[in-house]
Amino acid sequence: MKKPIALAVALAAMALSPLAAHQARAESFCTPGPGDRPETTIQGGLTLAERTVPGGFQGQWCGAREVGHNNLLNEQGLPRGSFGDVQFFGHCAYASMRDPSNLALESTGTAVLDVRVPSNPVWVRTLRTPAMQRAYSAFEIQKNIMISAFKDFGPSGNNWFDIYELGDDCLNPVFRSTSTTASGNHDGWLSPDTNTYYGIPFGGQTIQQNPNRIDVHVLDTTDKAHPVQLLNWNRNQLPPEVRDRVVPTRNFHDVSTNDDGTRLYLDLYGGNNALGGFPADGSGRCANGLIIMDSSDVAFRRPNPQLRFISFTSWCDPKNDPGYHYYDPDFDDGSTAAAHATEYIIHENGKPYVVTTDESAAGLDGDWSVVCRQRTFGRLIDISDETHPRVVSTFKPDIGKPENCQRIMTEQINGGMIHYIGFDDRYHVRLVVYAGANYGIRVVDYRDPEHPKEIAYYKAPSVVTTAAGENDFTRPDPRYDADNCMWYTGWNQGGLRILELTNPEYNGCMRRAVNGGGFLQSGKSKVNFGLQAARGDGGRGALSGSFELNDKEAGAKIHFEQLTLLGSVRDACGAILPTANAVQIDGTGTFNGAPASFRVCVQDSGQQGREKADRIFVTCTAGCSYTKEGEPAGGNIEVAQRP
């Protein structure tokens, strides 16, 4: 009985702690470098002139660049659009559809892409089992299990749920089952052990209209061929003092768990605005916030499992609201955007946090005429004391600050919103990457959780189906390939775009160093080579190195004079694929004394005497015609990762 008393006191608290009262905002610290095309107006904004140039918006970026993309063209040769979510496994990416216009089309469903050459991802097949035809945010991969749920409410009341198993041949996922869930699935979460699925319906009757409506439904997925319903839950099961505060919320929106599945994190989609549905009880009360539940009964499969309340953190803004836990001085009228995404993380400092986002109709539309009302930003919430979570910092681009409203209106500057989120390492987070709709991908460094800083952004150029005067937008969770330091992002018209950060401080693959030499056997002669490439200052400084090759049989001599790239493999390099022990080195120099450009890829397979040998690939990309690949018959190649 002690916990409910403490919680009631917390909910009624009238004073803010110093940390909660003075939230730090993430300022922009991205200094444009070579090849960048930075924003020209306020952070996150896009001017009318930029949106209406001939050929459409040309894109903007800072500290990030595109490695490759696939427009996902449909039967008419146009981008199929309606990008739902993106997932990544092995050398494969998966791109779902949010709201396909025609379920019967062969292009409708979840695209499977071969990304062994990241600069040229190839769409190889489409998964068209029932749920995969319209999977949105309830599209997850944990370990080698991939699940999807049909977005919102399925046709004829069939809320389809698919399970696939992934293996070495990730281009051909193994279908395990289709079942149905107890209610709809706008969002969903698969527990890290793959044995439990939490689904979140969206829409339908309000809790006042139907006191038995389902807010969360739980599926036992231990047997992948035969999922079993575990329980249904709604807000009426909350303690009365909490229930009465969240009744106005029409919907929950997002869900995640901690690593062992014993805690459940839910966001209340309760903004006092059109996107949040307005308060369902007509009270005008905002009910945005985070609910933490004890899900141990579910995780341990106890008889008659229950979800048990731990805490509710509101970020409805009025200072006279007796339940507020977070006050934002920019917006004190309660009309916040609707809480949207919620993700459990462990920071690199070892502490647990929840990262949340808000969304708004204005931010989704990007329309300059309403962008001043969007009230949307990301929050970092310290849950070390889960009974009293604390918002310690926010990410709020300048486009969302009220002091810029007049300029937005005058210059007709489109904005965006914080939508979904990704991380460099969920259990050792430094970087949070926001999919910000019209203001693109925004990368924020949270090394100091209370003083975050934006270090990169990317806004994609328009494609043929982008509406005149608008720009393409992104909302799926960005997914990180840690071995190759690449981000997989989804764009509503532009399809899949693979990005990388260009500062070696934030891109560990740029801090790799390679050294070695030896020879390839070519007939009766040898192809001798030597190479060295690294960045100074512990991997964060200037790039330098050398490469020499002498192929007497082919009459070819290569000499590098300048290195132009050192990082993960991204282009076609024969049998060398993007892995943690491979690098690509681009450079310019001479081929038999004449100017030329080259690509060299190497793979370090370990110590001599190992089962698999090192490998090198060399090709001329301009000024000559020469390619050589093989395993050194003598010598050694070493690839080292600098911290």
Name the predicted role of every residue range:
Residues 581, 588-643:
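Beta-sheet ligand-binding and adhesion/scaffold domains
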Residues 1-9:
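Bacterial N-terminal signal peptides that target proteins for export
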Residues 509-548, 553-554, 626-643:
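N-terminal segment immediately downstream of the Sec signal-peptide cleavage site
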Residues 531-598:
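Predominantly extracellular/secreted and cell-surface proteins with exposed
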Residues 26-509:
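Feature marking well-ordered beta-strand scaffolds used for ligand recognition
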Residues 107, 212-213, 526-528, 594-598:
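Short, surface-exposed coil-to-beta transition loops
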Residues 14-23:
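C-terminal segment of classical bacterial N-terminal signal peptides
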Residues 66, 111, 217, 379, ...:
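Hydrophobic residues positioned within well-ordered beta-strands of beta-sheet architectures
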